[in-house]
């Protein structure tokens, strides 16, 4: 089975009466010439790393090697525990986890690139928060990761998941789309609703540039992970409510590629424009590198 079209994956799943995750697990086992149990176990290890990366990123005092970032997940969690959040506990918890994982990455900890290190907090925060709120068993989260991976493969095949190729829309956009589709399946949505969630998430972030201060995956990347999980939640909520994307997911992916191709190289991970070249951005760069 090819992974070059979200619509084809959805059609195949519907034809066979399977969830996207079930279809992908069977397909990947066949491609890898391994059993489904072996593929499941491998994905389960990724889930464990995701959980560990959340805990590691909650450290109040741990700072990145550059000294630019650290402690924000702790601050956000304190606000959440104190009932000071605006958007409610679910989104608050998701933000905490997204920032925590991204901080773990900035501190050279172990994360799951999902699909990249720069966007590593979005998928885990979405799924682990949903698990916490709805008491979902690990096995269901592992299966949802197969759904997410399929969306990621299609995006990587037809566009890119790299900031250097397509800007942050490719990194945080892909992660948001993956998370949105996975959440929809976990909440009982259909494969078609997963497709709509993917499309909506990508549309919401189309055109976002990659402009890391000092060329490091910290500013604004860590906070963009919090924004990315928010985007995924919006897309999943809309899709589960029956809201459909007028533009199919596959066409949105192609549009994202075209937008990325039109972006100046200065806006694609080179730290030569955007926030990286603001007066404060330059000062922070000098602080790190002298």
Give the positions of each predicted feature.
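Conserved active-site and cofactor/substrate-binding residues in soluble primary-metabolism enzymes
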Residues: 37-49, 89-96, 106, 121, ...
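Functionally critical mobile loop/hinge segments
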Residues: 185-290
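Acidic-glycine-rich active-site phosphate/pyrophosphate-binding loop
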Residues: 88-105, 140-159, 204-212, 247, ...
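A structural-propensity feature for long, helix-poor, extended segments
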Residues: 146-178, 182, 204-231
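Glycine- and small hydrophobic-enriched segments that form the cores of compact globular domains
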Residues: 86, 113-120, 132, 136-137, ...
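Alpha-helical support elements that line or immediately flank enzyme active sites
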Residues: 124-135, 180-188
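Glycine/serine-rich anion-binding loops at beta->alpha junctions
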Residues: 103-128, 169-174
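Generic N-terminal targeting/processing segments that precede catalytic cores or assembly contacts
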Residues: 1-109, 133, 242, 249-290
């Amino acid at each position: 089975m090819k992974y070059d079209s979200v619509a084809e994956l959805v059609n195949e799943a519907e034809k066979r009466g399977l969830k996207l995750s079930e279809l992908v697990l069977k397909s990947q086992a066949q491609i890898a010439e391994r059993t489904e149990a072996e593929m499941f176990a491998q994905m389960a290890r990724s889930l464990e790393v995701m959980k560990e990366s959340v805990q590691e990123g909650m450290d109040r005092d741990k700072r990145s090697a550059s000294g630019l970032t650290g402690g924000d997940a702790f601050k956000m969690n304190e606000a959440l525990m104190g009932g000071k959040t605006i958007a409610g506990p679910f989104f608050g918890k998701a933000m905490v986890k997204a920032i925590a994982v991204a901080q773990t990455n900035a501190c050279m900890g172990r994360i799951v690139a999902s699909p990249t290190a720069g966007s590593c907090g979005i998928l885990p925060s979405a799924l682990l928060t949903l698990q916490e709120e709805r008491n979902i068993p690990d096995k269901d989260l592992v299966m949802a990761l197969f759904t997410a991976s399929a969306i990621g493969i299609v995006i990587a095949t037809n566009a890119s998941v790299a900031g250097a190729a397509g800007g942050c829309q490719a990194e945080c956009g892909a992660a948001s789309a993956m998370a949105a589709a996975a959440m929809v399946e976990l909440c009982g949505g259909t494969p078609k609703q997963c497709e709509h969630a993917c499309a909506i998430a990508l549309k919401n972030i189309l055109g976002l540039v990659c402009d890391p201060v000092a060329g490091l995956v910290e500013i604004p990347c860590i906070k963009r992970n919090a924004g990315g999980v928010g985007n995924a939640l919006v897309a999943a909520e809309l899709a589960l409510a029956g809201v459909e994307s007028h533009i199919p997911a596959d066409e949105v992916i192609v549009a994202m590629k075209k937008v990325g191709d039109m972006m100046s190289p200065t806006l694609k991970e080179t730290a030569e424009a955007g926030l990286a070249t603001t007066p404060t951005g330059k000062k922070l760069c000098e602080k790190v590198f002298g």
